[in-house]
Amino acid sequence: MEEEAPRFNVLEEAFNGNGNGCANVEATQSAILKVLTRVNRFQMRVRKHIEDNYTEFLPNNTSPDIFLEESGSLNREIHDMLENLGSEGLDALDEANVKMAGNGRQLREILLGLGVSEHVLRIDELFQCVEEAKATKDYLVLLDLVGRLRAFIYGDDSVDGDAQVATPEVRRIFKALECYETIKVKYHVQAYMLQQSLQERFDRLVQLQCKSFPTSRCVTLQVSRDQTQLQDIVQALFQEPYNPARLCEFLLDNCIEPVIMRPVMADYSEEADGGTYVRLSLSYATKEPSSAHVRPNYKQVLENLRLLLHTLAGINCSVSRDQHVFGIIGDHVKDKMLKLLVDECLIPAVPESTEEYQTSTLCEDVAQLEQLLVDSFIINPEQDRALGQFVEKYETYYRNRMYRRVLETAREIIQRDLQDMVLVAPNNHSAEVANDPFLFPRCMISKSAQDFVKLMDRILRQPTDKLGDQEADPIAGVISIMLHTYINEVPKVHRKLLESIPQQAVLFHNNCMFFTHWVAQHANKGIESLAALAKTLQATGQQHFRVQVDYQSSILMGIMQEFEFESTHTLGSGPLKLVRQCLRQLELLKNVWANVLPETVYNATFCELINTFVAELIRRVFTLRDISAQMACELSDLIDVVLQRAPTLFREPNEVVQVLSWLKLQQLKAMLNASLMEITELWGDGVGPLTASYKSDEIKHLIRALFQDTDWRAKAITQIV
């Protein structure tokens, strides 16, 4: 009040000095000079205070509060003077308008200078408050003070509504002051020291340790249970300037990624260090995963992630109106975490069979994890859709996984040896099969083919209870793909053996026929392209079997190529040796085919091979132009060897009559031993038994070779028409 008395005296002198209440120009100028003098003295004291603090750095115990009070008093006095000048003095003293306007400008300049001084004083006051808050370790107050300092120094209007932010003119003059750079440096020092102090305190409350060994690593996380202190520090630390990259990198590299990628042993305790900390220890191998690497079970991965979030839950406080600590951490780790989780954990955990699919809770578990991450503010459910999209694509993942697993198993079966065989349909003999076309004949197939059929049976037995009426069967088409794979791959994988080993080709033929029969039996199971598939299977098996039959025929023909007559009078030993060699070749083939092929297929095949051999033998005989009696006898004996041994190649010897040239061979033997009359009788004027196998020219040729040129021969030849 004592300081306010002179102010009112000056005003009273200025506006009532003439005794009649009229304003006096000289009195007003005198009052302004007095105020200016007081302001100059005040600014000199403020300047010295600022220089001591921010230029000379001298000891100074003066409180800025004293200067702020005086500055406020001068501000109010000048504003009152300006108001009175505007409402009373200027209206009454028209003759002094110019001088009074100049006085007004002078007062406003004084007021601007006071504003700058007050701005600097308030900054100084905030610095002193910072020191006091540091002494009490009140970090939230410290953070607020540092924010207000920034508002005063840099003109940030959004930091604090209570901060008396200066006008643009005051800011401009303030930034031109010599002390401005020093004030900025001091502010940055205080901000850095606050950040370091908060980080050190945070590191004591949240302890992250990683110990590495030659082949393993142990990671320990300890979080203080003092929630009040912990959240105060976290709220102060996790402000906008703070960069949590180091913390996020540690969590991602040492905790999140290993938990997803490797088997991890987790040890959780809520009573660490005498109950003052929550502790989570993670131990895992660091050796690079090999081909035999076993992925951790997805349930264990999700449980370990929950433990990690639960351990760190104490730091997940709100740092602003719309942001939490886990949200800040999530911005740094969520993209890689979600990608690893889906690609390396969840997709490999998708079931590979419908039995597993029926009991799997993978979708429910993923949905629960997603909700946990949303509730923890790590992910935004509208933007971070990786887990939701996994659930949406679950059926596709399942179908692809099942297809891939089935085809991998099918390919593994295809690689197995065809020679490892097993008897099927042991009681379905040819007679029963002939009467019932739906029966598969008794034969041998590869054990791998039997396993292949078991795999297809297992696929067809897969329950589809979870599929809706409109949903496609997840196994649709896989049978067709498997069988086409078998058809295409077996000839490639076993090419050399199929070409060189007769039994391999026969087994592949039987396998294809067995698959054809299986497809026909399951015609009502929705197998894609059923008819075309059955035809392809049948044609493929027959094609490779035909190649082997033709090869065996070529062997017989190769032997018969050396069949030559040493002379016209005697047969010699060569032809008999070659005939026996052909029969021996057929007997060897019988040993590998008789119990493997279905009986009807075996009989038809051997009839064809024997016919090839017999037809060539007959052709060779008919190349002779002259056959002596001795030669005819020896040829008869040669043919008799064939007639005796060929029937033994069949399970039922009578099957030999199905050989096309068999009757012709028998009749040839008969003609070699017959007289001229007997031959003509067998011809019987073109209606005898010989006409079933021979043409007239063949009979004439044989008569000319067997008999000398006589009238009887000529007469007989004339009867052969």
From Swiss-Prot:
Q: What is its main location?
A: cytoplasm
Name any one Pfam family assigned in the record.
ZW10_C2
One GO biological process term is: cleavage furrow ingression
Where in or outside the cell is it found? Cytoplasm; Nucleus; Chromosome, Centromere, Kinetochore; Cytoplasm, Cytoskeleton
Entry keyword set: Cell cycle, Cell division, Centromere, Chromosome, Cytoplasm, Cytoskeleton, Golgi apparatus, Kinetochore, Meiosis, Mitosis, Nucleus
Q: Which domain of life is it from?
A: Eukaryota
Q: Does the keyword Nucleotidyltransferase apply?
A: no
One of the record's GO cellular component terms: endoplasmic reticulum
Q: What happens biologically when this protein's gene is inactivated, per the record?
A: In the spermatocytes the number of Golgi structures are reduced and they appear smaller or have collapsed Golgi stacks. In third instar larvae spermatocytes, cytokinesis is abnormal producing multinucleated spermatids with a single large Nebenkern. Acroblasts do not form and instead appear as an aggregate of multiple unfused vesicles. During anaphase and early-telophase the central spindle appears regular and acto-myosin contractile rings form normally but during mid-telophase the rings fail to constrict.
Note the Gene3D superfamilies from the entry.
1.10.357.150
Record GO terms (molecular function): small GTPase binding
| InterPro entries found in the cross-reference section | Zw10/DSL1_C_sf, ZW10_C, ZW10_C_2, Zw10_middle, Zw10_N
Q: How does it assemble?
A: Component of the RZZ complex composed of rod, Zw10 and Zwilch.
* Xref: PANTHER family: CENTROMERE/KINETOCHORE PROTEIN ZW10, CENTROMERE_KINETOCHORE PROTEIN ZW10 HOMOLOG
Q: What does this protein do?
A: Essential component of the mitotic checkpoint, which prevents cells from prematurely exiting mitosis. Required for the assembly of the dynein-dynactin, Mad2 complexes and spindly/CG15415 onto kinetochores. During cytokinesis in male meiotic cells it is required for completion of cleavage furrow ingression, possibly in conjunction with Rint1. Required for maintenance of Golgi stack number and morphology, and acroblast assembly. Its function related to the spindle assembly machinery is proposed to depend on its association in the RZZ complex.
Say which family it is in: Belongs to the ZW10 family.
* Name recorded for this polypeptide: Centromere/kinetochore protein zw10
The species is Drosophila melanogaster
